[in-house]
Design a protein with these regions (language model features):
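Formylglycine-dependent sulfatase
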Residues: 1-197
Length: 197
């Protein structure tokens, strides 16, 4: 996930950008600011750029999409829903072997608003502007992220097409590309696993 995203956005092998591992919660790691991204190159020649969806290229300010050349960004910084990474979720078999006791100590905060357990599920920002949390860290908010990313993507396309401005937009959904039939019986414990089957 992280390595292929880094390769697509930089045009370089992930090992060269240092993004060769799958990023996990609150690592205080991410793509370095000096990496040249597709968005930066396109911005230099007059394109409007946007990123909406799963970013998964780090949880440090310099790695955020709007700090990597995108004019606007609406993104999740991690892999899937963070609220599953808890002891309670592990006891319910929603996650295996990952809970907050395994995470590094980290004084990380996104802006002047502290959030539950120090991490942010969904953020938004504009080039040169502040990063802000969108919604809360609940499952309900997470389930709204893909429709919101789609809405923003369509609005970005319409706005730039109307202005006659060239644009590049990346929309990377957090969930699988289809929702399984609700009438289908499955042994998978989650909708994500159903989609992957």
């Amino acid at each position: 996930c992280t390595p292929s995203r880094a390769a697509c956005i930089t045009g370089r092998y992930a090992v060269r950008s240092g993004m060769y591992n799958i990023g996990m919660l609150r690592e205080s790691h991410g793509m370095r600011g000096e990496e040249v991204t597709l968005a930066e190159v396109l911005s230099k020649v007059g394109y409007a750029t946007a990123f909406h969806g799963k970013w998964h290229l780090g949880d440090i300010e310099e790695s955020y999409p709007h700090n990597q050349g995108f004019d606007e960004a609406f993104f999740t910084g991690y892999n899937q829903i963070l609220s599953l990474n808890s002891k309670k979720a592990e006891l319910a078999n929603a996650s295996i072997g990952l809970h907050e006791d395994l995470l590094p100590e980290d004084p990380y905060k996104l802006d002047d608003t502290f959030v539950t357990k120090g991490w942010v599920q969904i953020a938004e920002g504009t080039k040169g502007g502040p990063t802000r949390q969108w919604g809360d860290n609940s499952h309900e908010t997470y389930m709204k992220s893909d429709p919101e990313a789609q809405r923003r993507t369509l609005e970005f396309i319409e706005r730039n097409a109307k202005a006659g401005k060239p644009f590049y937009v990346a929309n990377c959904p957090n969930m699988t590309s289809f929702i399984p039939n609700p009438k289908t019986v499955s042994t998978a414990p989650s909708i994500l696993q159903d989609g992957l089957e």
